[in-house]
């Protein structure tokens, strides 16, 4: 007998969001995670020189689901203890700057565009006119339209300084193939409801401390279980529950949320592939391509003294720099991010670190010699968010079986918010069906 227990396969942000939601509703939850650490593709990494993250993440003020979960597991003081909230500020020192003023939406965006530095007046006005057209269309475009096509009439300077960096950072997909509609969804969420929705929320702690650790405590304190280094190799739906195979053991659960990476899904679904819905989901997932993200950590023997904790770089090769001294109290530590498949990021990590060090000396200047570096490459950091892509919906997959993951169709690219929304959707559908 299952005794009403629920299993969640996958201890990333989607799986933990589902597990926290189920636990909060009084269900006994067991989380299975193949790795020895929770967090999935947004986790802490322990180095000889200290603790970092496998990638530098930021949240937006519009990420209500994620913020709600953080408050559930941490309490009310998520800000400023765990997240530093700043009004939208994008800057390439001496070249470009966009700052959102403290005005209601959408005036904060329109004013920010009108006052952009590094862009001529004519181009600023053209950008404002473009955003006004988007508002009239309610931020909708044909599903197969790429971001490049969407921006075809935009000034080159604005595309280069604003739209392309935002697209690459958010969708991790080049303009030429990225989904115009998903890009517009992000703009709509950030700039059309509340002024604070466009705020940047920068983590002040490592990603493990931000959510996975506290989520695990929340689950365990309420009678749940976290099983690390437990690989689930098989899933089979039965008349009275779902049988999971982990190692030599088989256990029966009342229902299961599958929240593994999309590239891991097909193995789990082998016994279910005859079901029509499962076959359709498997086909959509098999069609996904993936994009890497590379994060280089460079440590200098003294503080960086950057004007902002996050600055845009020139892409040769680093695209963004985060001052971990300002954010995490780690003076001299920089996290430099390269999204999408930049040629330099494919090579030797030591050479890449040297190239980024040279880039920072060129752009920032007044830097001492590098103390140490560590490059972390996530080869499947996100799915390629291309135009016209069909993704499976989160939630019911087969009787007693539910799907969650940042690759599911949540109107968002592969973000922390997309992951947590999918987990909550799956959990709520499960709760509604299995009282």
Per-region residue spans from a language model:
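Helical element adjacent to the flavin cofactor pocket in flavoenzyme catalytic cores
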Residues: 186-244, 255
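Mobile amphipathic helical/loop "lid" adjacent to a hydrophobic cofactor/ligand pocket
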Residues: 63-72, 76-180, 184
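Conserved flavin/dinucleotide-binding core of flavoenzymes
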Residues: 319-435
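Glycine-rich FAD pyrophosphate-binding loop
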Residues: 23-47
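Mid-domain catalytic core of redox enzymes
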Residues: 86, 233-350, 359-363, 392
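N-terminal Rossmann-like FAD-binding beta1-loop-alpha1 element of flavoenzymes
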Residues: 4-31
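Glycine-rich active-site loop/strand segments that organize a redox cofactor
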Residues: 42-61, 128-135
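A short coil-to-beta-strand element that immediately follows conserved catalytic motifs
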Residues: 80-82, 227-228, 290-293, 366-378
């Amino acid at each position: 007998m299952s005794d009403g227990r629920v299993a969640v396969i996958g201890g990333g942000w989607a799986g933990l969001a589902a597990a926290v939601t189920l636990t909060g509703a009084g269900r006994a939850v067991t989380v299975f995670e193949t790795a020895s650490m929770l967090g999935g593709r947004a986790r802490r990494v322990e180095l000889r020189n200290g603790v970092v993250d496998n990638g530098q993440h930021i949240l937006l003020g519009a990420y209500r689901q994620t913020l709600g979960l953080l408050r559930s597991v941490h309490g009310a003081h998520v800000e400023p203890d765990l997240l530093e909230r700043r009004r939208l500020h994008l800057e390439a020192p001496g070249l470009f700057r966009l700052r959102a003023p403290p005005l209601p939406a959408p005036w904060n965006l329109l004013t920010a565009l009108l006052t952009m530095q590094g862009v001529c007046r004519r181009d600023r006005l053209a950008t404002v006119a473009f955003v006004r057209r988007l508002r009239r269309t309610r931020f909708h475009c044909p599903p197969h339209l790429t971001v490049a096509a969407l921006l075809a009439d935009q000034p080159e300077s604005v595309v280069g300084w604003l739209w392309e960096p935002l697209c690459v950072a958010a969708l991790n997909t080049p303009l030429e193939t990225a989904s115009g509609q998903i890009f517009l969804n992000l703009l709509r969420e950030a700039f059309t409801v509340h002024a604070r929705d466009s705020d940047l929320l920068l983590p002040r702690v490592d990603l493990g401390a931000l959510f996975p650790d506290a989520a695990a405590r929340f689950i365990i304190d309420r009678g749940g279980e976290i099983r690390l280094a437990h690989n689930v190799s098989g899933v089979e739906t039965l008349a009275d529950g779902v049988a999971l195979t982990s190692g030599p053991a088989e256990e029966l659960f009342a229902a299961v949320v599958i929240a593994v990476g999309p590239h891991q899904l097909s193995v789990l679904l082998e016994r279910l592939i005859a079901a029509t819905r499962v076959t359709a989901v498997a086909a959509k997932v098999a069609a996904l391509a993936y994009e890497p993200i590379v994060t280089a950590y460079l440590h200098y023997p003294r503080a960086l003294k950057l004007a902002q904790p996050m600055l845009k770089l020139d892409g040769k090769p680093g695209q963004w720099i985060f001052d971990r001294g300002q954010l995490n109290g780690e003076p001299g530590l920089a996290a430099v991010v390269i999204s999408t498949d930049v040629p330099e990021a494919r090579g030797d990590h030591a050479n890449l670190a040297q190239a980024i060090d040279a880039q920072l000396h060129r752009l920032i200047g007044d830097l001492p010699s590098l103390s140490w570096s560590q490059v972390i490459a996530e080869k499947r950091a996100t799915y390629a968010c291309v135009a016209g892509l069909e993704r499976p919906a989160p939630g019911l997959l087969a009787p007693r079986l539910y799907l969650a993951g940042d690759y599911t169709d949540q109107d968002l690219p592969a973000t922390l918010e997309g992951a947590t929304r999918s987990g909550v959707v799956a959990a709520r559908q499960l709760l509604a069906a299995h009282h």
